[in-house]
Amino acid sequence: MRVQFWGARGSIAKPRPSTARYGGNTSCIEARSARGTLVVVDCGTGGHSLGQNLVSAGAEGVRGHILISHTHWDHIQGIPFFAPLFVPGNEWDIYGPKGLGQSLREALAGQMQYTYFPVPLDQCGAKIRYHDLVEGTFDIDDIKVSTRYLNHPALTLGYRLEADGVAVVYACDHEPHSRMLATCHADITGQDLRHAEFVNRADLLIHDAQYTAEEYPAKVGWGHRGRDGRHQ
């Protein structure tokens, strides 16, 4: 399985020379199996560049899947600018957590109302299917997808993709359930143990590490974790 990062930032895009090393766009990951199954995980502002790349490749009848972790803007802002959604003949399945107070489709359509964007979601040319998810496991062609709830202020899912003998785990916005675990050495129990089991033995782990150890104490409860390497 091949993975490419199109966006790794949080909150707001910051395209500038000082952010060039890791890029300035918000969350968007592309994963492809050896068979060619295309899965996009989150569609922040990095989704614009990915979409342009797919269109420039010239392929017709693109079939793809988008897994949305949650509907905070930095994870869905690329949807209105994701060019393959506007191409007739393309087919896309979009997945996201169930229980947002509205359907996934309604949440995504909200940011494309005329008040905010000139083209509504239902005028996209591609055929789009929407799937509201809970914790569980399902298959996208040859890719096995497992979901697990993360600890974040919005209802958020982490994704584990398994194909071609490897596993990729995407746990974008997550804070340890135990404050003791987040700030010092502690035994992993309860929901934190479930999370550890979910990410265990991943060949590639893409995980929240928003704050330095010095920053984190002032950000407890914000739904992100600090990074100090002790629990890697």
For each predicted feature, which ranges?
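Cap/insert and terminal regions of metallo-dependent hydrolase folds
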Residues: E175-Q232
